[in-house]
């Protein structure tokens, strides 16, 4: 029988726990809100100053206008002919085009309230600014607590590299490279990875996993491949069953789910992948592009750069690198919990 005194103590503990949870939620909300607000303020000149970008944005603008033309004129908007480049080129036949089609649809559905030029600038601005939300949501879906996820979102936009075409602002802003499709993939990739990981573990959620993974692939082929390879590594992370007879069965179950997911994504994107593979002999790589963009820089370059703090904090105090080292150590210390091994696996794999 519960005495009144015991009931009062239990009730007080419940109220205290509820207050702590609310406080944690408030702190997490403020941290993510600050990260987004900082990006919105810091990047506002990208849309406030209307000047032509001195980078690849010009080509992406042409592709967006081509998508608008294809949709409005009833043409095959998945494989139009771009006659404004050289003697003409079927860009969408060889190049991921979901970002262009999405921007074109926004332009049409908003009754052309904004020009394609303005839409490309505004979507770049908003996607970059909202990237912390993508990281926060994805970490929560993987199983991290609110504060850890909020801290991930807080620092998500703070990397600085020496022009490595990565996730930092230099890849997308006016003074950078203007890699518009990669920006879409960068924002969609974390949720895709989180949802797909849940499919591997629980065997449910195939629809959203297929949708997000296909969106990542059709925004940037390399980023879609990154998700698939990462999921292949994550199938080996059921550490709670590492020394039991269940381990092979769990691994096999996860691989079957990954293969099902792979087949579904290939079917959804086959309209693009099949012609791309069949017509691959006609696609040539530019001799002007650095081969390291495709082959990586190798350990001989990356490890010394990481040790010097230049890989994530180029030309500044290595604050992000220090936080990375601390987080890596915490994850290793908690290796028995599977979710903490996910950052370790991803970082170790793609340091290549």
Predicted feature residues:
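Membrane-embedded transmembrane-helix bundle of lipid-linked glycan/lipid transferases
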Residues: 2-3, 8-352
